[in-house]
Amino acid sequence: MLTGISGVMAQMALEQAVSEITDYLKEIDAKLDDLLRDQKDQTVSKLAGISHMIDETMFIYQQVGSISATTWSKVSGCPQDIATIQAYAIAKIKSLTEKAEREQDPKQVRPLTQQIRQEIHQWLGMLASAVKMQDQVSCIELARVCQEEPEQLEAYKKGIVLARNKRLEEIEQSLNALGKQLEEKAKTVGGQVLLNPYSSPHAIANIESIASDLNAFASTLQLEHIHLHVEDGPTWIEAAGKAVDDTGKACRMPGSRPHTPSKTSVMR
């Protein structure tokens, strides 16, 4: 294990992050398994293999307490593939965000949000896996540097922290963009309940589910800048009642009076 106190603290923080992400992944494991099983894309298909290799290397390190050149060679090339996986998932989330931004028809918000609700678990799972795997590689890298170049340990630790923050910031920005569009769509369909009594409540329910998923992910990765909250829209009865009240108020306004038929119209 690392001998420098600073290095040990950094490693412990990364290992704690890995543990929390692992717990999160267990909760959405079925969705991610479906993606890996059905996806023919080469980028996605690499995920399981890379994860297995990194887990094996971490196990060896924990058993032996050191990182040999052979052990390090197993994972030294993984960061490039991990970065590709993260970029792929972010691109998918951006695609969903752009679809939400383009859709202006309130009636189409329900199928759109249903699609996002079905897909978001998979892309969040990929992002969580990418962060977890990179944290594991960083633990191994710190151990390797401590063995081979202990005088460089502090600089490596700072570099790893900065790189991790940059990756999380990119993820955070993509999720905030999606959240902003969902909030806008919630406001739009929330005001259309009277005209769309079926699709609007279902769209709101979809958006609330997506918001819950995004917040759970943000909490796991401690992305403090994601504050996604969707208020419940009015029910049809509430919307209808408000419409009646508004009409009544308009009729009671000064200068407004009920229409009375003229004598001519009565005679007819």
Regions found by a protein language model. Name each.
Residues 2-5, 9-12, 31, 110, ...:
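Residue-level signal for well-ordered alpha-helical segments
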